[in-house]
């Protein structure tokens, strides 16, 4: 295959990889559940065999079973609630109706650049309901517990809210512990059996969400619509698995239950943010389901048998906040995997680590991207220089190649043979010019996911009109400059021998300008910087080569 053919193929491949393959990989090719589903069984209840002795890995239960009462968000409208504020949370509301956390806003994350209102991650607002609740279940039936506020006390800089309630012969004391600087909330329940017989109790910590944040908003040219929304979970046997809301909605209301096997967590994921329940017991089970097609629920439940006049303590950790690796890595095994950079996450994590350290020095993510690009070009300079020297040599051979084309214009086989002889005589590899592009592909993909998934770059400004590097350039200045840089770079490269190839190459800058117009401006900034450095390197090397090899 000719060098120009390969160069065109690589350029087109980059576009296809981002627009078609990479963008929807997780959604189009969900994780393989074959092994798990082979052990699935049908049970009459979500809470069947809730004790730790069960061996079932995954259970798909009957949609009509009494898993939990279907969520009625409107019941919180007139119910009393307690409001707590911390250094990171604004207006955390705990309903006295059942102890659910029905509201939590993030002080450090505004809704948008134009609306500086703190983003509500948990909310009971109609149309965007998303709550965290802890349900007490007796004999596989949820019981209604109305709580009373016992006040908030401060211990070691932490706010501790205590609620008490009783139902069905049980006395429940629930505490919520808030750390002023952290997004995790410790939820502990002390359940006392005041009856004369043993009681089988389950504590079900769950999320209920009244909508899919992604909805049907996928757009081929909207990079942010490629991000994952749905359920993620981890167990001792399965370190990380995801199920999209779209796939869960196809289960006809049948919940899926998974053994945690001693450790695990369950979470709702959306772009930049995660809410996770982390049970502290070793016999917890994880589940997820869809109710009535428009309410999604996921949680972890723990069972215990409480003897008469005895108590049982069951606790969990609730995390609701940004997907920042440093926040998650110590909370639970594999929780940091919710920061998912895709197939090339190893390279993405290295790139982000370097960018983060540079940002700590320069204080601007745009400058960090530029400096990371310079560093990458410096590392790969020996390979690039070799490629540019080969291209310079090819450029000097153009007159001889044109003469061969004129001589053998009616015999393509002979032309190909003569050109290969020329390349061999001059020790030129026509494919070497593709090497820099090959190197860029994994780096480009890795940086793409860093810019798309890292919450640190959400609403991060650069200069002038670029107020958010995670969003597209509002005036398309960077994509146009990137297209012009591609055009200039083509002028420095050897012209394609085939007129048709030349026309295709001529239109590629226009095509890529159009494609990059919808990409995050930080990514376009990287590509533009990369092109400008490449042009400078190629121009200097070409001039030097021509000056030292004149005949």
From Swiss-Prot:
HAMAP family: YidC_type1. The lineage of its organism: Bacteria, Pseudomonadati, Pseudomonadota, Gammaproteobacteria, Thiotrichales. Signal peptide: none annotated. Residues 33-47 have a biased composition (Polar residues). Belongs to the OXA1/ALB3/YidC family. Type 1 subfamily. It comes from the Bacteria. GO terms for cellular component: plasma membrane. It is found in: Cell inner membrane. It is a multi-pass membrane protein. Required for the insertion and/or proper folding and/or complex formation of integral membrane proteins into the membrane. Involved in integration of membrane proteins that insert both dependently and independently of the Sec translocase complex, as well as at least some lipoproteins. Aids folding of multispanning membrane proteins. This is Membrane protein insertase YidC. The keyword Chaperone applies. GO terms for biological process: protein insertion into membrane; protein transport. Coiled coil: none annotated. It comes from Francisella tularensis subsp. mediasiatica (strain FSC147). One of its GO terms (molecular function) is membrane insertase activity.
């Amino acid at each position: 295959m000719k060098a120009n053919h390969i160069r065109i193929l690589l350029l087109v491949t980059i576009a296809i990889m981002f627009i078609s393959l990479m963008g929807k990989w997780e959604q189009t090719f969900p994780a393989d559940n074959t092994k798990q589903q082979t052990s699935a069984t049908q049970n009459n209840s979500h809470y069947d065999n809730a004790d730790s002795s069960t061996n079932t890995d995954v259970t798909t239960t009957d949609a009509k079973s009494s898993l939990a009462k279907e969520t009625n968000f409107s019941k919180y409208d007139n119910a009393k609630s307690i409001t707590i504020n911390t250094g990171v949370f604004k207006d955390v509301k705990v309903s006295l109706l059942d102890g659910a956390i029905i509201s939590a806003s993030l002080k450090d994350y505004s809704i948008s650049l134009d609306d500086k209102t703190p983003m509500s991650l948990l909310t009971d607002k109609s149309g965007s309901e998303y709550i965290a609740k802890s349900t007490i279940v007796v004999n596989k039936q949820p019981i209604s517990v109305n709580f009373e506020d016992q006040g908030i006390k401060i211990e070691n800089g932490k706010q501790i809210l205590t609620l008490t309630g009783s139902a069905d012969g049980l006395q429940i004391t629930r505490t919520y512990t808030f750390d002023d600087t952290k997004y995790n909330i410790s939820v502990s329940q002390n359940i006392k059996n005041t009856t004369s017989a043993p009681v089988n109790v389950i504590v079900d910590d769950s999320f209920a969400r009244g909508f899919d944040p992604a909805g049907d908003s996928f757009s081929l040219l909207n990079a942010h619509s490629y991000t994952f929304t749905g359920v993620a979970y981890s167990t001792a046997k399965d370190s990380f698995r995801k199920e999209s809301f779209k796939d869960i909605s196809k289960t006809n209301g049948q919940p899926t239950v998974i053994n945690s096997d001693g450790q695990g967590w369950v979470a709702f994921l959306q772009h930049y943010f995660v809410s996770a329940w982390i049970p502290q017991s070793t016999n917890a089970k994880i589940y997820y389901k869809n109710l009535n097609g428009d309410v999604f629920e996921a949680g972890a439940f723990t069972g215990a048998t409480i003897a008469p006049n005895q108590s049982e303590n069951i606790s969990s950790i609730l995390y609701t906040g940004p997907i920042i690796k440093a926040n998650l890595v110590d909370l639970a095994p594999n929780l940091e995997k919710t920061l998912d950079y895709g197939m090339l996450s190893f390279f993405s994590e290295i790139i982000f680590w370097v960018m983060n350290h540079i940002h700590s020095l320069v204080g601007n993510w745009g400058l960090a991207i530029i400096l990371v690009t310079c560093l990458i070009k410096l590392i790969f300079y020996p390979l690039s220089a070799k490629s540019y020297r080969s291209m310079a040599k090819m450029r000097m051979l153009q007159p001889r190649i044109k003469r061969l084309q004129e001589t053998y214009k009616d015999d393509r086989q002979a032309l190909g043979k003569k050109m290969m002889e020329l390349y061999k005589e001059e020790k030129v590899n026509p494919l070497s010019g593709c090497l820099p592009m090959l190197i860029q592909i994994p780096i480009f993909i890795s940086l793409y996911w860093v810019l798309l998934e890292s919450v640190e770059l959400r609403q991060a400004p650069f200069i002038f009109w670029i107020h958010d590097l995670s969003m597209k350039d509002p005036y398309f200045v960077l994509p146009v400059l990137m297209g012009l840089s591609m055009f200039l770079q083509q002028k420095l490269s050897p012209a394609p021998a085939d007129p048709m190839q030349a026309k295709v190459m001529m239109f590629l800058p226009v095509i890529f300008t159009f494609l990059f117009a919808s990409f995050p401006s930080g990514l376009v900034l990287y590509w533009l910087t990369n092109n400008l450095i490449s042009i400078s390197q190629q121009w200097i090397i070409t001039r030097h080569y021509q000056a030292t090899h004149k005949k």
